[in-house]
Amino acid sequence: MPIAKPINQNTTVPYPPQHYSKPPLVIILTVILLVVFFIGFFAIYFCKCFYHTLTEAWNHHYHNGLPENQIQAQQEPVQPPVNPGLEPHIIQSYPLFPFSSVKDLREDKYGLECAICLLEFEEEHILLRLLTTCYHVFHQECIDQWLESNKTCPVCRRNLDPNAPENIKELIIEVIQENAHENRDQEQTSTSNEVMLSRQSSGNNERKIETLPDKFSRSKTTGHSIVRNKPEEEDRYTLRLPDHVKIKVTRRHNNNQTESCISFGELVRNREGRFGEVSGQSLVPESGS
């Protein structure tokens, strides 16, 4: 049996070799994602700072020399007016009447239609609204809705706001023209009376009446009403009325005397207090005949 040798304390005992393992794949991917995230974050941050600095430099160069209040006015959005159309009481002041009351005032070959919906006026009970500024006529529903957002006529684009400076001047001119027209009508009435007297006293009055100026014409039926001829215009949006009726309607509207629905039978009465004929068409039957 071999004898065991004593172990020297200074002798090192050999240890088994250690094996080092690589870090797991999850840790590597996590580190890579964190690096990419921080790089992207700082890149976006620096781009935003650069864009902000560039924008301020451009605005300073563009608005250089402009006052601050003007710069703010340019930056503020332009808002539309609260009420771009006419006031409701102004819309309601324009004459309203049924189509049957003016159907006979125009010749049948000329149609009358609404310029908004482009429908011809055929039914007698429909209500029409007349713009006395330009005498264009429309359906009540069409023109009321239009004037709620506009201040001009749909046909001629004339300003209908009575407070506009141009309308105030035109109102003064219309009053002067109406007075001159009334004086001219009085002269025509006196001339008409002289013609009728000469017709009764002379047997050759027919030849004298035919030699009168072309601006006068004799009534086709009774012969007692003489009015001025006006050239016929094919305007399917305009209501052509006799001059004295037009003056009365305009005057009532300018004086804010227009009712909710007017009657043209009351307005076509001539100055002798009797109903007559205009342009060969009977408006209403003569009183007392």
UniProtKB/Swiss-Prot annotation:
Gene Ontology BP term (one): protein ubiquitination
Organism: Arabidopsis thaliana
Primary location: membrane
TM helices/strands, residue ranges: 26-46
Entry-linked Pfam families: zf-RING_2
Name the UniProt record assigns to this protein: RING-H2 finger protein ATL30
Catalytic activity: S-ubiquitinyl-[E2 ubiquitin-conjugating enzyme]-L-cysteine + [acceptor protein]-L-lysine = [E2 ubiquitin-conjugating enzyme]-L-cysteine + N(6)-ubiquitinyl-[acceptor protein]-L-lysine
GO terms under cellular component: membrane
Keywords assigned: Membrane, Metal-binding, Transferase, Transmembrane, Transmembrane helix, Ubl conjugation pathway, Zinc, Zinc-finger
PROSITE patterns noted in UniProt: ZF_RING_2 (PS50089)
Pathway field: Protein modification; protein ubiquitination
